[in-house]
Amino acid sequence: MASPSQQAGTPEISSGSSQCYINNLDYLLQEKRMLVEKFSVSLQVISPVHPGETVFLPRRHPLPCFLDSSRLKPHSPLEELFLRSSLPEQLSFLHNGLLSNLYLHAADCPQPLLQWLFQLLTWPPETSSRAFGLLWDLSIDGLFRQPDEDMHFWCPSLQEVKEVFSSLGAYNPALYPQGPFQHSARVLESEASLDSQDPPQEVALDIKLNYIYKFLTLCLLVRPVSYTDASILDLMELLCRAGLDVGLCLLPKTDLQQLLLLLLERIQEWPGKLQPLCCALSWVSDHHHNLLALVQFFLDVTPRGRQLRSQLSLVIIARMLGQQESLPFSAEKTQLALLSQLLSLMRPSSLRQCLGIETLPSSLGQHSKASAELDYKVCYLCHSLLTLAGVVVSSQDITPNQWGELQLLCMQLDRHISTHIRESPQAMHRTKLKDLATQTYIRWQDLLAHCQPQGQYFSPWKDI
């Protein structure tokens, strides 16, 4: 007696002597399934957007910000009323524009008020926008009312900036060892009623951060020596962590980039602080794509910006390949020579050995799936590393003396990466990596043509 599956595939003769298959649905579905699997395309593609880090925890209600008025002496009945009022009443002064009437054209603006307004930048946009506008106006107004030789301009300290970021919900233990501020049991009804009018949390967070970035930029422009080199390095690390928040991945970083560029120019001991800064920034995230996005926070419009982009990219590549301790960054080797040492380690097969330390599952189905997942991770990592390698080269002023080093990089790129990528319709991530390798090779060849020494003829087959 035949099994049901056999019966499904057994032809029967109809009365018209024509052959037909009875109950062949299962057989046809299996056949189509095999056909689909054969020509299926993997959904795992290399995303152009970095995954981001969870830096800020969602916070529905703002933390109370109390004005320290213990040392303030009122100069008018209205100011006395403001200083003695509760927080909701003081906020109404801000919303109604009464604070501008009190302090905008006053001879001296009290520093506790400026500190209070800076803390209010972490509140919902309805309040933070007014706080930023008044903080900006008071700061600018003070510049025109003070003589240049005796000018006093308030800038928040590094600790105050950290506290503001913590009020926004930042919880990173490396930056905030005391832990995030706890939610207060007291919720201000005046602000809670505005929640329905507020933009989405990601947009609201971006608005608040941009207010902070703009004011810090103003501080650095007015007082170039506002912070020591050590404080600048810590502040840049804090800002880079904040910029990698997962909710901000798709939002522009214009204000952050301008602030980072200005902080970079304010470092006194340069290039002595370059390597410590790169080492600190290379540990801001453990994901290679996030670190690539971090490099792109720094614009290449100044010599220092290009130096940092190049050195930071090199340090990140070394860290991802486990070579950060062994690579002689302080030696007299050029960055192209150091990159040449790392490029051979970026071979997909070498990366596969590093990422595939764990044994693959024994069953055939799980082994195939795990192998495909590993192949995707290898191509994803190689794509980020190769992009960083392109940043290193593009940040250099290639001279004829470096022609040989760049020629060697072209050969290594073709030998170790391009020829080791086997494209497949089922693995589009390989195609994207292959495209990047080809584009990088073409750009480097173009650089070779422009910096070719006299009497030299470049041959890609020449053995160096």
UniProtKB/Swiss-Prot annotation:
Native source species: Mus musculus (Mouse)
InterPro entries assigned: CANIN_dom, FAM178
Membrane-crossing segments per the record: none
Pfam families: CANIN (PF14816)
Name of the protein described by the UniProt record: Protein FAM178B
Protein family membership: Belongs to the FAM178 family.
